[in-house]
Amino acid sequence: MNKDFYISIFGDRYDREAVLFPASVTILLIVFALGNILHGYLEHIDVLDSKVHMTIFAVLILIITKIMMWIIRTLSKNSIERLTYGKEKLNFPTISMLLPSSSILSNEYKNRILLKAQKDFEIDLNTSISNQEDETKVRKVIAEVTNLIRKKVSRLERTETYLIKNIRYGRCRNMIGGSTIAILIQLVITIYSAIKGYSLFCPIISITISCMLDLYMFYIYKQAGIEYAKELF
């Protein structure tokens, strides 16, 4: 398969590991919840009786996966991050760890980052922070600089460690978004199954798995953000 075509369909490494993987897990959890309902429909349809049907089936799976990737990415960035780090994401670790009151990084290391920001972007961040009494304004000043750092890093050849940390953070965030979507859809499936008299085994098991996955990802999400922020600097 042509590399450019492969990337256009499945995305780069970040897209595959941080977005495609959560989307695939979400779809599998939803399909499992639909087990009894799908079985009732599919036993009357020979989906794989020809190459045409197989092609249509494969294309449908691809379309559903791409749509789910977009939904998860959008929901996670606009909802999960804002719920965790505030509306303007001013509590994100890349900002919080540069505050004078933060103990995540040593003062010496923070000063090195501030001096590098002054050298690279001609912004005296140390003075700007010292002159601000309102912490929200301080966070906004730091946010502007960290955005510049992030853009600079994205243009450079990223190290393997940075990419791994970035993927891990993105995957945790998107898994939370994906499992939340799965839970909502599974609840609808459970209600429908109860009304129609289908077995509730598959919906209940899938909801349990999704809830456990959601809780676990929430547990490691903030730590993944801190590790990503440290690697960015």
What are the functions of these language-model segments?
Residues 193-233:
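Alpha-helical oligomerization segments
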Residues 80-158:
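Charge-rich cytosolic interhelical loops and cytosolic tails of multi-pass membrane proteins
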Residues 72, 102, 109-113, 161-177, ...:
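Charged, low-complexity, helix-prone segments enriched in Lys/Glu/Asp/Gln
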Residues 1-107, 198-205, 221:
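N-terminal first transmembrane alpha-helix
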Residues 50, 54, 127, 131, ...:
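Generic, low-specificity signal for short hydrophobic/alpha-helical stretches with a mild N-terminal bias
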Residues 10-27, 148-202:
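Transmembrane alpha-helical segments and their cytosolic interface motifs
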